[in-house]
């Protein structure tokens, strides 16, 4: 299922990019808590459960709330939740077996399931499009607004 893994991985990466950009916008607004520091944030994103779509979406929503921006639409949140449940650790579609202790491996997919790859790919595409084309655009516009405000302040406007 490499194609499904690639879709899922792209979604994970765009969530991480969104978290990093939202944190950067908060820092530019003057927030100084250590959790927003790029190195600290990278450690957190690479730490425990680094591939959890649910954890990444939760972190993103906390940051969006602090920026007073709209939360992810319920339909997107539901898609992320269902995709997370299907593959909570980013291993289900990547490996045929996963470590289950010292020298022990379990099937990555313990029960056989038939998956409509086309429908699943569409779910990934919809969530990815909202995040990459929608949310990252909103955050980019916010960055431009911050830059305009800074220019105006430096000119005494």
Set out the residue ranges of the language-model regions.
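Domain-scale activation on soluble regions of proteins
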Residues: 1-157
